[in-house]
């Protein structure tokens, strides 16, 4: 049987899909029911919110609405090293996104699942961002592994 040809393969005899790097080694627990992402506009230029993005999951006590705010590397660095910064714990990061979330425009309605207990691969982060996130005391069950 021949190789399955899909589109223009440029004489390539191998078929690959996906990417080669895993984000999670293991996920054990997540926050119940995903939340609506509140800061989609921060991610338009990137086109997606990658799996493993640090986030703050919250539930409105009055309405029960679940929300998630995802943080960029720049926001994390600013919280730790910016002038008058209050430290990484001030962001309220209590989880990391489970999967990639595609973002088409600032009007995209997106939801995400926040993992609160699991093993995440450290190579998914810049070294300085990983060191800052390891100091976060609001998400102690997510372990950075090599």
Language model features: what each stretch is:
Residues 1-146:
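Surface-exposed, low-hydrophobicity beta-strand/loop segments enriched in small/polar/acidic residues
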